Amino acid sequence: MTVVTRATTPQPFTDSGVTLLPNYFTGLVPPTPLRSDIDIDACPTATRTLMQFADNLGRAVGYDRERGGQVIQDIFPVRSTEHQQVSSSSKVVLGSHTESAFHPHKPRYVVLLCLRGD
């Protein structure tokens, strides 16, 4: 018999509203892709875990201007952009920014899941 459990989202641990949920099983993590022009669900178990937490906060949505409206965006480092100010960089600290600052329907939450710090 399989027992399905629902991920629960605790109250924020900090005054800034950040909640850190370490050590959740995300399945096997594949090698980092060599190119950024591929559309993959690199880790389906991680995607389901992320969506379970997001579902507790509200309805997950995507914006047309951000990766064509994808709700889940697999972002991974790419060697050719490692020193640039882009989402696929890995050797620089990204500057603080938002793509939806002037959108009439701003997000209330941003949910991030890190699979590997490479």
What positions do the PLM features span?
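Fe(II)/2-oxoglutarate oxygenase catalytic core
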Residues: 1-118
